[in-house]
Amino acid sequence: MIDEIKAQLDSHQKVMESVKGELAPKIAAVADLLVDALGNGKKLLVMGNGGSAADAQHFAAEIVGRFKMERRGLPAIALTTDTSILTAIGNDYGFEQIFRRQIEALACEGDVVVGISTSGTSKNVHGALLLADQVGCRTIGLLGKDGGTIREIVDVDLTVSCDDTPRVQEGHITIIHIICDLLEKRLFG
């Protein structure tokens, strides 16, 4: 059992080294996008499925509440939280439309839309990001594996190049925390 624990921690460390080596400039670019958008009255919309839905909620909570600094709240919405909206859209239009319909209703030009997908192929995230681009939003993918089809359609992809979903999720939440830290320091530091 101890060997398995050490192997998992080694795997985690390898992913973090990859994130540090490959994604630092892109993380900075995303922080810049968010500083610009939120500093100019725009909002953040975040979505994902399963564990990525939880990450979307976590991201929005850090933006609306706070990460480390006492500051005013900033506008962010996790498109994963309203069960009435999700089930109404899912029932009437299908699961692939649950985020797209919300983008149609809530997104404005200049907003930032983040799609989180450990596979990079979530159809409901993909469709919503396409619409967000048409609306004039900046689009970001927090992705895994090779980035899948979503990597090709976003303005900035933060792809954690790993096939192990738990390690990808660990990379995603670390990236989210770094972005929140940079954002607060730039806007309020």
UniProtKB/Swiss-Prot annotation:
One of its GO terms (biological process) is D-glycero-D-manno-heptose 7-phosphate biosynthetic process. It is found in: Cytoplasm. It is an enzyme of class 5 (isomerase). It holds the Pfam family SIS_2. It catalyses: 2 D-sedoheptulose 7-phosphate = D-glycero-alpha-D-manno-heptose 7-phosphate + D-glycero-beta-D-manno-heptose 7-phosphate. Residues 34-189 form the SIS domain. Its cofactor is Zn(2+). GO terms for cellular component: cytoplasm. It comes from the Bacteria. Coiled coil: none annotated. Disulfide bonds: none annotated. The keyword Isomerase applies. GO terms for molecular function: carbohydrate derivative binding; D-sedoheptulose 7-phosphate isomerase activity; zinc ion binding. Keywords: Carbohydrate metabolism, Cytoplasm, Isomerase, Metal-binding, Zinc. Catalyzes the isomerization of sedoheptulose 7-phosphate in D-glycero-D-manno-heptose 7-phosphate. Belongs to the SIS family. GmhA subfamily. Homotetramer. The reaction produces a racemic mixture of D-glycero-alpha-D-manno-heptose 7-phosphate and D-glycero-beta-D-manno-heptose 7-phosphate. This is Phosphoheptose isomerase. It comes from Geotalea uraniireducens (strain Rf4) (Geobacter uraniireducens).
